[in-house]
Structure formats: C-alpha cells, structure tokens
Amino acid sequence: MAATTANPEMTSDVPSLGPAIASGNSGPGIQGGGAIVQRAIKRRPGLDFDDDGEGNSKFLRCDDDQMSNDKERFARSDDEQSSADKERLARENHSEIERRRRNKMTAYITELSDMVPTCSALARKPDKLTILRMAVSHMKSLRGTGNTSTDGSYKPSFLTDQELKHLILEAADGFLFIVSCETGRVVYVSDSVTPVLNQPQSEWFGSTLYDQVHPDDVDKLREQLSTSENALTGRILDLKTGTVKKEGQQSSMRMCMGSRRSFICRMRCGSSSVDPVSVNRLSFVRNRCRNGLGSVKDGEPHFVVVHCTGYIKAWPPAGVSLPDDDPEAGQGSKFCLVAIGRLQVTSSPNCTDMSNVCQPTEFISRHNIEGIFTFVDHRCVATVGYQPQELLGKNIVEFCHPEDQQLLRDSFQQVVKLKGQVLSVMFRFRSKNQEWLWMRTSSFTFQNPYSDEIEYIICTNTNVKNSSQEPRPTLSNTIQRPQLGPTANLPLEMGSGQLAPRQQQQQTELDMVPGRDGLASYNHSQVVQPVTTTGPEHSKPLEKSDGLFAQDRDPRFSEIYHNINADQSKGISSSTVPATQQLFSQGNTFPPTPRPAENFRNSGLAPPVTIVQPSASAGQMLAQISRHSNPTQGATPTWTPTTRSGFSAQQVATQATAKTRTSQFGVGSFQTPSSFSSMSLPGAPTASPGAAAYPSLTNRGSNFAPETGQTAGQFQTRTAEGVGVWPQWQGQQPHHRSSSSEQHVQQPPAQQPGQPEVFQEMLSMLGDQSNSYNNEEFPDLTMFPPFSE
C-alpha cells in the first residue's frame, strides 16, 4: 500500500516516471519500488533543491568559464598589444620611410634647381613642379630639340642654315666661335672674324683661344671656360638679373653644364687687308672705327676689346660622333663654349664719330619763385659756358638783357599764376664770353601735392639757332601791334559788299596826298572804336571825368595824331547807320536845318593814336586836296599864321563829351571843304590860348586856296576844342575866351552835285570819337578788336 500510495505521489510528483513504474514486475517491482523510493527520496531533495544543485553546477562551470575567459582575455590582450605595437611600429617606420623619401626627393629637386640656370635666376625659390618643367626645357635646349618636332620633320620655311647663320652674325655685329672648355682649342670660328679682327679663319683654326687673348686676360678666360664647381671663388655677377651673388650653391650653378657666359676680354687684332666689297657695310665701318687701346708701337701686337656672350654646351652634341683621328675622340663627353664676340665700338676713343658729336643746346634749371637758381644741369657748361656753381644762388634776371628783364620777370609771375601749365618766353642771355644768346625758356611750377604750395619752378633753357631770323615772342597777355595795310582805316559799320569800291576810291584819293605812306602805318588796335548805345542814354553825356587815353592811364597814347585839323570828332554813331548802308556817298544834299544849343569851334584835333609824321603840313595837304577836288572855286579865305601852344593830355580829354546829333548833320559837316573853316556860335567863341582868334569866314561856299607863306610847322598842334567840354571844365571856359573873338552862326550849306568827297579815310580812321568808354562800362566789347574784324 505504501508502494501504491507512493506511486501516485511519485506519479504526481514526477509524471514522467509513472508509466515506467506501472509497467514493472511485482517482485522486482517491490525491490525496485523500494529502490525507487529510496531513489525518489534521494531525488526529492534533489528535486527540491534542483535549482540549487543546478546552480552549484553552474557556478562551477561559470568559475571555469571565467577563468578560461580571463586567460583568453589576458592572452588576447597580449596579442592585441603586441599587434598594436607592431602596427604602431609599422606606422612609425612608414612615416620615417616617407619622410626620408621626401627629404631625398627635396634634396634631388634642390640639386636639380641648382643645375638649371633658369631656376637659379628667379628672385625666389620655385616650387618643385616649376623646377621640373624648367629642367625639361633646359635638357631639350642642351640636346638641341627645343624648337624641333620629335619626328624630325621640321625644316626652315625659306632660309638655309648658312643664310640664317649670316643673318644672325650680321645682326649680332660680331663673329661666332666654339672653343673646348678643357683645352681652349678653337673648334669653329665663322668667316666674319676677318672684318672684325682683321684675321683670317686660318689663323684661328688649330690654335687656342688663350693664344688670341691678351696675356693678362688668360686667367679670367680660364675661369670662364672651367666647369668645375670649386673653380670659382668670390662673388658672382649675374648679368641676367644684375645682382651680385655670394659664393655657395649658386657657384655650382654658374660653373655647371649649360650655364651662361658673358665676359669682356682683349683679343689680338691682325693686319690683313679688308676688302669693303666682300664685307657688309657694318663690318667696313667697324674696321675704320675699331676700338683700339691707344697707340700701337711697331712690332707689338694690337689688341681690341671684345665682348663675348654664349653658353656652355655638351661636346659632341647628341647624335654626333667625332672622327677617330680627332684628339678628343676618346675622352668621352666634354663641354665647349659656344659664343659670339662683338667689338665695343661705342666706347672707341679714336672713332671719327666722336669729333662730330653735337654739343648740347639746352639745359635744365630749377628756380625759386624769385627766379634764383637752385639747381643747374651740367649741360649749361656747353650751352652758355658757365659752371653750375657759378649760376647757383644768382637770379636769372642778372644774366638777362636789360631790355628783356621786365619780360622775364613777367613770365615768372605769370607761370606762378598758371600753376603747372607750361609758359615759354624768349630772351637774350649773357654767356660767359659776354655774348648775347637767344634763349627760349619753357617753365612750369611744381606744386606740393599735400600743401598745394609751389615748391619751385622748372625751366628748360634752349639755345635758339639763327635767332636773328626769328621773331621775338611775347607773353600771352602782351598787347599785339600788327602793322596793317590800306584796309585798316575801314569803319566797323562798313559792309563786306562795299569793301572793293571803298578801297578803289581810297587808293585814288591817297595817291594825291603827300606822305600817304605814313597814314597806312598806324595801328588800328589803338583807335577808339564807335560805341552802339540805345535808349535814353544815347542823348546823355558820359559821366566819366578821366579820359580813356589820359596820360595818367597809359603813357603810350600821349603822342597822338599831329597835322590832322578838322571837326573829325563828329563821327557817326554806329547805332544810326545800318551796316549795309553806303556811307558818305557823293551827291547827297542836306537841307539847312538850325542846330540849336550846340557849340562848334574851329579846333585842331589830336586823336588818341600814334601815327608817323607826314612830310608836308596839314595846311598844304588840305590845300592840295581842295585844289584837286574842285578847281573851279576861286574864293579864298586867308588863314592868319599864328603860333599855338601844344595841347596837353587833359585838353585831349575834352573831345570825349557825348553830344547827340542826327546822322545828316554828322555826315553833312564833312561834305564840303567849308566845313573845316572856323565856325562859332554865340556863347562859344573860338579861342586859342596865347594867340589871336581865327578870322570869321562869311563865305561858306568858299574853298581853301594855296598859301605860299605857310611853313611845315605852321599848324603842328592846336588846342583840343572839340564838340564840347567836360562838366567840370565848363566853368573854366571864360578863362579861355579871347576878347577879340567874334560870334557867327553856322548855316549848313547845300552840297553841289558831283562834288568829290574828301577826308573819308581820316574819318574812317578815327571812327566815332564823340563817346569815350572803357571795358568796365561795356564788358562785352573788346577794346582792341582782332585783325579779322
């Protein structure tokens, strides 16, 4: 029962064991059951503590695994450490290897750059790519393949090698030679050595270059031909860059293969005759102007200075083999110097061109604002004879002609105002041998760019050749005085269509006037031109109290027009006559019209211009003109010869009062010779200071008759009693009146038809002098009109 009771428990506890127990035998089953029970009892704790048992076993396994893992980890860490060390060492070794490789490559690149001349000539060290590129170019140039194609199909377009060689030698003005660097033996020399050194080619072949140069230049030549690195000591002059380089790595570059050579040496000059036909023109000139080193003694060789320029090349060239009989055939690859020798003709002391050198004709000087020399060019010695120290500190005006000193001062003042613009002036400069030289000075100022102040004046002084034939220039602000021809006395109102008949009429009238050559030599720029006035101011006198040409304003106009005596101040205002109207046409008659409130006096007029004195007096001129113009009139009023004092500049100013009159009266007063007779109105008697008054002429139609008692100085000057007087002079009129003066009323006479016109050229010369003006009142009018007007 116990077994049976135990079995359910066992089956309940262990379901998997139930079928096994039920299927067992009885006998053995009891024993087995007891055994099973015992095993079951033994297993129960085991089953109760299954986890523990399993845990214990697991713990044991974990311990074993942990130990093994630790061992494995330790072993693995050792392996990893060893591998990391190996990798690190490998990386370090690789970096070291790369660094060594880079250092080697840099060293080779540096050495290559030292061997290539174009790399060393650069201002700074080039990069590696540039060094390699230049090295390739240099190697191509050494092999002679720099300008040829790789397939060898390149050929010159139209020149052969010989033609190209001759052109190069002629352009280089020298001869080509090739010498061995080791021995100095001449390998080749061109035929152009004959006109250069007067030596045939045969004298150079078979000899050495040391035999052809001066003995003192042998050592220098040996240094230039040497290719060893230690041959050159000291400093090197790089002719391409113009810099002096110290001894060092650059020396190896200069002495290696392919480096450039340029040196000067003295070479032997032969005595062979040169045929000018067989050589070119430059060679013939070279033969005559060879650069000798002084006089040559008999029996001594003659040396000349030769400039040699070339390169060190490999010999023999690539692809060329020397013949077996050549002494240098078995020595392997050698070097040679390929160079061109040229004469130093420009420094020849005995050249014939030196005697024909033109002396300098200009020098540059610097002055302060006052004109004192602060710098003088050395060419002043050949130009004016002075040393620079003789001119420094002195004023340029001191060396100027007295007549040109003011002109030079004005030019310096003007150039200061121009501020940088060039001003030229010509003056006479006293040279050291006390001769006057015409100098043209072009000057301009230099301004400080910061302070804008004038620092100094720079002058270029040029000695002018044939100065007597050149006109003397003036400043830009100097008044020009051209000498005009017979058209100078045309009034401004004259139209262009009236010019031809006007000139013909004036030429006819001037042919019968004595001394007419003097009338055409006056300057029209000094004549007062008529002024066009409009509005109510046309009838107002000017309020200026000082005449335009008064003596205190411009002394040049103090001497003015003697021997012209008429009321020519009564010109026509330009506003009253159109430009196309014929002036002073013959045959015009003017009706008699009274002229109220006007004072007309017989006066000698002195217009403010300078004119050459005619040979005859004005009275004789008037008499001859009147006799020629109307010989039928016979009434003769006599002029009383009197002595009259000369007028002053203030009396000239009395002519400037503006009195208004109509055009017909202005023109009519010049239509007949009687208008030049003495006339007066009540209240305005004629007066002549210190002399008797003119007798009145009652016959207005009479003409002037010739007088035999008149002298040349009879009517030289008269009092300037013109149309009116200035307002401040009106109160002084009683002082100038004469007690014996008579009053007459002038009646304008009617002109006879066909009566010729006289004194038109005088009227047109004077223009309208009834108004005095200046540039301040009429700013748009020029006081001195140009010749074209």
Curated annotation (Swiss-Prot):
Modified residues (Phosphoserine): S77
Residues covered by region (Mediates the transcription activity and dimerization of the AHR:ARNT complex): 167-171
Renumbered residue ranges of the record's region Disordered: 1-97, 465-492, 672-789
Result of changing R99A: Diminishes DNA interaction
SMART domains membership: HLH, PAC, PAS
The keyword Nucleus is annotated on this UniProt entry: yes
Ranges of biased composition (kind: Low complexity): 672-696, 723-733, 743-756
Subcellular compartments: Nucleus
Disulfide-linked positions: none
Record bears the keyword Acetylation: yes
Assigned keywords, A-Z: Acetylation, Activator, DNA-binding, Isopeptide bond, Nucleus, Phosphoprotein, Repeat, Transcription, Transcription regulation, Ubl conjugation
Alphabetized SUPFAM superfamilies for the sequence: HLH, helix-loop-helix DNA-binding domain, Positive stranded ssRNA viruses, PYP-like sensor domain (PAS domain)
Polar residues composition-biased segments: 1-14, 465-481, 708-719
Molecular function GO terms recorded: aryl hydrocarbon receptor binding; cis-regulatory region sequence-specific DNA binding; DNA-binding transcription factor activity; DNA-binding transcription factor activity, RNA polymerase II-specific; nuclear receptor activity; protein heterodimerization activity; protein homodimerization activity; RNA polymerase II cis-regulatory region sequence-specific DNA binding
Compositional bias per record (Gly residues), positions renumbered to this chain: 26-35
Domain PAS: 161-235, 349-419
Modified residues (N-acetylalanine): A2
Ranges of residues in domain PAC: 424-467
BP-aspect Gene Ontology terms: cell differentiation; cellular response to oxidative stress; embryonic placenta development; negative regulation of inflammatory response; positive regulation of endothelial cell proliferation; positive regulation of erythrocyte differentiation; positive regulation of glycolytic process; positive regulation of hormone biosynthetic process
Biased segments, Basic and acidic residues type: 60-97
bHLH domain span: 89-142
Effect of R101A: Severely diminishes DNA interaction
Protein purpose: Required for activity of the AHR. Upon ligand binding, AHR translocates into the nucleus, where it heterodimerizes with ARNT and induces transcription by binding to xenobiotic response elements (XRE). Not required for the ligand-binding subunit to translocate from the cytosol to the nucleus after ligand binding. The complex initiates transcription of genes involved in the regulation of a variety of biological processes, including angiogenesis, hematopoiesis, drug and lipid metabolism, cell motility and immune modulation.
Protein name in the entry: Aryl hydrocarbon receptor nuclear translocator
